[in-house]
């Protein structure tokens, strides 16, 4: 009952591991969310980039949402494999061109070292963001006080000048 011209192939959204997860647990979890596909029959598996071995992964149930379906799958990568790139392969009858959809995920170590050179960088970034927020609030408060003073001065001047008799 789907329109023939509608694109009902799986639409992927990817989520990469957090810096906290990779630093604290020495693992990283890639998440692939597939949405707005029809019919519900779909196969998802994971491989290392340019590899042939299917990796152990988990997936949620296929859920129906507004006439289409969604599913998510995730791969938890141990520390020894964080330097490798991975891909999520999606088999679905409505994939464009009839080929399997391959979604690439970058190396966790490459992303982590690119983002934060040092563990203190995260704290520095948080401190900088918080400082910027409070500076903005302070400037906003200053502007509101300045507006009140100028408005009061203008109103007072108008009332004083308005009572004078004109000749």
UniProtKB/Swiss-Prot annotation:
Give the main location.
membrane
Q: Which residues lie on this side of the membrane: Cytoplasmic?
A: 156-167
Known SUPFAM superfamilies for this protein? Immunoglobulin
- Record-level GO cellular component terms: external side of plasma membrane
Pfam families (UniProt xref): C1-set (PF07654)
Localisation per UniProt entry: Membrane
Stored PROSITE patterns:
IG_LIKE
Keywords, ordered alphabetically:
Immunoglobulin domain, Membrane, Receptor, Transmembrane, Transmembrane helix
Question: By its UniProt entry, which InterPro entries does this protein fall under?
Answer: Ig-like_dom, Ig-like_dom_sf, Ig-like_fold, Ig_C1-set, TRG_var/const_region
Q: Does the keyword Transmembrane helix apply?
A: yes
List every stretch annotated C region. 1-134
Membrane-topology annotation of the record = Single-pass membrane protein
For this protein, the parts annotated as crossing the membrane are: 135-155
| Miscellaneous comment as given in the Swiss-Prot or TrEMBL entry | This mRNA was isolated from a cytotoxic T-lymphocyte. The gene corresponding to this mRNA is rearranged specifically in T-cells and its organization is similar to an Ig gene, with V (or V+D), J, and C regions.
Would you tell me the protein name for this molecule? Answer: T-cell receptor gamma chain C region C10.5
Query: Which organism was this protein described from?
Result: Mus musculus
Upper lineage is: Eukaryota, Metazoa, Chordata, Craniata, Vertebrata
